[in-house]
Design a protein with these regions (language model features):
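Helix-loop-strand module that forms the ligand-binding subsite of alpha/beta enzymes
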Residues: 1-56
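Glycine-rich phosphate/pyrophosphate-binding loop and the adjoining helix
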Residues: 60-120
Length: 120
């Protein structure tokens, strides 16, 4: 979960991915959830997709969640600014993340970070 900070991902979120360069997140599925106090929230997703996977080898799943007007969001009961389908979207994405995780278990046996930890 990354809050929008001046139209971008927070420096702390970016720093976390810089610190995880020793395989902690390698070949594990991830779901980006962006939250915004206004109508934004898309830029942190684009930023994390473009810059956080290179050295971490984290595998972002194709889906993402943007919760806009986050102050009004409470699962199951939320204000007028939150779409009714938001809870279903969150459930769908979490189920998909679990499915990716379960299906990637067989790939873990093939990973050779010792010889090929940095790509090419």
């Amino acid at each position: 979960v990354v809050p929008e900070y001046g139209g971008m991902a927070t420096p702390q979120a970016k720093n976390l991915f810089l610190l995880c360069g020793d395989g902690e997140l390698a070949h594990k599925p991830g779901l980006i959830v962006s939250i915004s106090s206004g109508n934004g929230g898309s830029y942190p997703i684009a930023e994390l997709r473009s810059s956080s996977y290179k050295n971490t080898h984290l595998m972002w799943i194709p889906e993402n969640i943007i919760i806009r007007n986050v102050e009004d969001y409470l699962p199951g009961s939320h204000g007028d600014l939150i779409p009714e389908w938001m809870d279903n979207r969150v459930d769908y994405c979490l189920k998909l993340l679990i499915a990716y995780s379960e299906n990637m278990q067989s790939l873990i046996k093939l990973i050779n970070r010792k010889d090929f930890g940095n790509g090419m």
